[in-house]
């Protein structure tokens, strides 16, 4: 995440980078032009992005922070295709889906059961 980057901008940027890397790989391998679909999803509690927990303790802490809270789940998608002719630029389209989710309050025992 870049300093001061909003969650929506972050997920769109990451998805765009995935698309660029995928199109570059197609070109590098000399494969014929084909549509490439990339996506990324992030959860944000306010402006704080919640990444994938690496440990059970992190998962418990994340669920506890979401307990009783309203947060956003954002998925960015991007579709691109290399140009048909050599030197023709790639074309692309992108979009963002944003959903608001409210977790019911969870006890410590309920959080533990999820993990």
Protein language model features and the residues they cover:
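Anionic-ligand binding patches
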Residues: 2-115
């Amino acid at each position: 995440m870049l300093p001061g980057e909003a969650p929506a901008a972050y997920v769109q940027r990451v998805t765009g980078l995935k698309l660029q890397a995928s199109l570059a790989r197609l070109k590098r391998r000399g494969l014929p032009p084909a549509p490439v679909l990339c996506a990324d999803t992030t959860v944000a509690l306010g402006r704080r992005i919640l990444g994938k927990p690496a440990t059970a303790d992190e998962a418990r802490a994340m669920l506890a922070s979401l307990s009783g809270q309203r947060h956003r789940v954002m998925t960015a998608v991007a579709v691109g295709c290399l140009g048909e002719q050599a030197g023709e630029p790639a074309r692309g389209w992108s979009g963002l889906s944003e959903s608001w989710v409210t977790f019911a309050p969870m006890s410590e025992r309920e959080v533990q059961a999820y993990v």
